Design a protein with these regions (language model features):
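Conserved nucleotide-binding/hydrolysis modules and their immediate coupling elements
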Residues: 11-20, 24-89
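Structural signature for extended repeat/solenoid scaffolds and their inter-repeat hinge/linker regions
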Residues: 62-223
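Short, small-residue-biased leader/transition segments that mark boundaries at the very start
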Residues: 1-8
Length: 223
């Protein structure tokens, strides 16, 4: 059913996510709760204006609504339950990923990190390129992309097309097995990934344009 369900949860923290165009989005970190059949531990707060308009503060008990498949939303605080030391939230003035100053342009609601060397933006851009609406590189998810970025092997979308099966199979996944040996990606997954990368070369140009993730260029404009 698409009926909305409301629950009351404690707002443990407000963290900041950095998107592929440098946009900073505040995220409500909640005590996990089951709403409308799924477990919710985070909800978007959109931007600083929205946080201040709703006046939600870390430590507050907040009303969380989930309707259908929509991302859960924080409606507002229960003021009667507010801790005495709760302070109004402000967007950090430096990027949580790279430490560069963030700016908010005239007439814009969003703060942005404008550093071209920001790791969080690079990761999001690389994931966007591989995503279903763009080049659709099947199996190229966040964990693998993160490891490739950390190993210095992937920093630009062109780098995808220089990856080979052997080096992918040896990619250290940052975990160890029960014998304490590093877990590697392995040849089965590597073979599938190389095939998916090759297949992505045949996508129409509009998909590549969308995959580049230029600000204000959505799928329709790209086409």
């Amino acid at each position: 059913s698409s009926a909305a369900s409301d629950v009351y949860k404690r707002l443990r923290d407000i963290t900041v996510q950095v998107g592929r165009t440098g946009k900073l989005t505040p995220v409500a970190e909640l005590d996990p709760v089951v709403v409308a059949g799924s477990t919710v531990a985070r909800a978007t707060l959109h931007n600083e204006d929205e946080v201040q308009r709703k006046d939600v503060r870390v430590g507050d008990t907040v009303i969380v609504r989930k309707a259908g498949d929509v991302i859960p939303e924080v409606l507002g605080p229960v003021l009667a339950l507010r801790p005495a030391d709760a302070v109004q939230w402000e967007m950090p003035r430096t990027c949580p990923s790279c430490g560069s100053p963030v700016i908010r342009e005239e007439g814009e609601v969003d703060f942005r990190c404008i550093s071209i060397d920001c790791p969080a933006q690079a990761l999001e851009r690389l994931l966007h390129w591989a995503s279903r609406g763009a080049m659709d590189i099947d199996g190229m998810g966040e964990e693998i992309v993160s490891r490739l970025v950390e190993s210095g092997r992937l920093s630009d979308v062109a780098d995808y097309y220089t990856l080979d099966e052997v080096e992918l199979s040896l990619l250290d996944m940052g975990r160890v097995n029960k014998d304490g040996e590093p877990i590697r990606l392995g040849s089965t997954v590597a073979k599938k990934l190389v095939a998916a990368i090759d297949e992505s070369r045949t996508r129409p140009f509009a998909r590549a344009l969308f995959g580049l993730g230029i600000r204000h260029v959505g799928k329709t404009i790209a086409e």
